[in-house]
């Protein structure tokens, strides 16, 4: 990788950063090895009339590289797309740690905090 800093970003289309900030919920198995991060984007740019093409996945990008998932669904309200729900799944502790490093960078860039419910 180059020495330049890559701003942490989420993309539904390659090269186009999503500006809507998602709500993110984490779940983990009892042994802590597997789990999911569920992202919900209300009124994301990716669903605007200006965007064209199909959403085939979500990419989380930062200095370490990219994390990808194809598990992406649209939510509809009155027949119109209103939100995107995407699920990133990890299967090992190291995958979880990598995801958390991305999440911390993304949160810091966007002034977000963490709350336990």
UniProtKB/Swiss-Prot annotation:
The annotated topology with respect to the bilayer is:
Peripheral membrane protein
Q: Where in the cell is it found?
A: Cellular thylakoid membrane
Give the record's GO CC terms: photosystem II oxygen evolving complex; plasma membrane-derived thylakoid membrane
Which UniProt keywords are given for this protein, alphabetically ordered? Membrane, Photosynthesis, Photosystem II, Thylakoid
Q: Which regions span the lipid bilayer?
A: none
Q: Provide the GO biological process annotations.
A: photosynthesis
User: Do you know which InterPro entries this protein is assigned to?
Assistant: Psb28_c1_sf (IPR038676), PSII_Psb28_class-1 (IPR005610)
Q: What protein family does this chain belong to?
A: Belongs to the Psb28 family.
On assembly, the entry states:
Part of the photosystem II complex.
Q: What is this protein called?
A: Photosystem II reaction center Psb28 protein
Organism whose genome encodes this protein: Prochlorococcus marinus (strain MIT 9211)
Gene (UniProt)? psb28
